[in-house]
Amino acid sequence: MKKIYKNVVIGKNAKIGEYVIIGEPPRGYKDGELITTLGDNCVVRSHTVIYAGNKIGNNFQTGHGVNIREFNEIGDDVSVGTHSIIEHHIKIADKVRIHSNVFIPEYSYLKKGCWIGPHVTLTNVLHPLCKKAKECVKGATIGENTKVGANVTILPDITIGKNCLVGAGSLVTKNLLDDNYVYAGVPAKKIKHIRDLTCPYDLIKIPYEIEEVD
């Protein structure tokens, strides 16, 4: 059993799992008032909820139990892992991969090709429950092809450059603007250039090349 609300457009060759809800009206909107689009070849696995007002590209995939709120722009070839939460008014570019149990708050921007590891938490309010908190909601911006390791926490209004690697368990408290670097620690600091990484198993000389973004 699944529920597809009014004004939902789903492309060709879609696979929609059991107990999926697509087009859930956000508070203050009626069924079908907002258009919701998913491109071709999407795979939406069981118990996922996609609210109305989303624009989602081709080859989109979810794990199980994903929650995607309203008014997001999601590009082509994006995947969102099991039990991850995507809040509203978020921009996710092409070829972004979001692992399981990730939290992405409103007004975040994930640029093309970035990878977000499991249990990563982005935040968007510096002082929760402050009387003015709603006036300064600012999500993080993750640069093109940047990899964010497991259990990283990123504070509000942070920008991370492109082709970076943020080490597992890091706490990002300030902008990491230099492209092509490894950052790690609590708080996260610059460790080395991405080309200086080596494989401990001698399987490859350089784990990451300097990737160019189309």
Predicted segments with their positions:
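Structural signal for interior beta-strand "rungs" in well-ordered beta-sheet cores
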Residues: 2-184, 190
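ABC ATPase nucleotide-binding domains
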Residues: 200, 204-214
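C-terminal end-helix/capping segment
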Residues: 186-199
